[in-house]
């Protein structure tokens, strides 16, 4: 009987051993995933931008006016040079009509996509001892040709802020001085050390979405990609004004800028 009991016990042990080999090990409990870091809340001063309209392009048009009385521009003292002195001219720092339409304001789109520089050459002409045009924009990397069309010596002194970019004399009947400017967002100032009244400005931007207001204060920026943008207007004496515009495919968008005439420009 004792022998039978031992055999039964041995059988139980063997069966238990087989069951242990067949059972899979119990996996460890899953580790809880780390809680995601909460995103920073939008600043109250900078609300989330509105969704941009669907693709396409449109034009941005508008006018620039001066609501106060335009300052009187003095006659330029040009008689130090016999050629320049033949033509009387007024200072062109402020050019406005009697009803307040303001010329020579550079309007540009902020945040528009970058584009390659065009193959066209932008021109700065020295005519009648004045820079023409007085204000213009170029695409970063675009060739700029500076021409002397006068029968007198000029000196092209170009500044970025207070730093000289180049300073080069240009005698009559000589080839153009050609330059490429790549400083996106820079307003360059052109002077002539021979004729101190000569002044010109070139805005450099990495896309072609800019324009200059004409004698009637109007401007038009062609083919702006659809979207919501900040638009900035700059005047050499009155400084900057900003606005917003939403461009929709095939539809002109309009923005207007008003200067009071009492503003003072700061360095660009």
Predicted segments — roles?
Residues 15-17:
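C-terminal motif of bacterial Sec signal peptides marking the signal peptidase cleavage site
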Residues 6-13:
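Bacterial N-terminal signal peptides
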Residues 20-268:
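Extracytoplasmic copper-binding redox domains, predominantly the cupredoxin/blue-copper superfamily
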Residues 1-5:
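Positively charged n-region of N-terminal signal peptides that target proteins for export
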């Amino acid at each position: 009987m004792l022998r039978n009991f031992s055999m039964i016990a041995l059988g139980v042990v063997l069966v238990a051993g087989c069951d242990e080999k067949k059972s899979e090990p119990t996996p460890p409990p899953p580790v809880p995933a780390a809680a995601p870091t909460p995103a920073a809340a939008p600043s109250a001063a900078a609300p989330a931008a509105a969704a941009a309209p669907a693709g396409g392009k449109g034009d941005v048009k508008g006018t620039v006016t001066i609501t106060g009385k335009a300052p009187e521009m003095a006659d330029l003292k040009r008689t130090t040079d016999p050629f320049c002195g033949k033509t009387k001219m007024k200072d062109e720092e402020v050019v406005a009509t009697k009803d307040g339409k303001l010329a020579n304001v550079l309007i540009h789109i902020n945040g528009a996509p970058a584009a390659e520089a065009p193959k066209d050459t932008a021109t700065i002409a020295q005519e009648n001892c004045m820079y023409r045009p007085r204000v213009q924009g170029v695409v970063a990397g675009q060739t700029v040709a500076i021409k002397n069309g006068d029968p007198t010596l000029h000196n092209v002194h170009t500044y970025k802020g207070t730093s000289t970019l180049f300073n080069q004399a240009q005698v009559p009947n000589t080839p153009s001085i050609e330059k490429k400017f790549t400083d996106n967002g820079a307003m360059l100032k052109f002077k002539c050390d021979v004729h101190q009244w000569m002044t010109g400005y070139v805005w450099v931007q990495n896309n072609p979405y800019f324009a200059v207001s004409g004698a009637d204060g109007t401007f038009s920026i062609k083919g702006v990609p659809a979207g919501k943008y900040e638009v900035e207007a700059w005047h050499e004496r009155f400084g900057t004004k900003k606005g917003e515009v939403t461009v929709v495919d095939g539809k002109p968008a309009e923005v207007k800028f008003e200067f009071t005439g009492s503003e003072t420009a700061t360095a660009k």
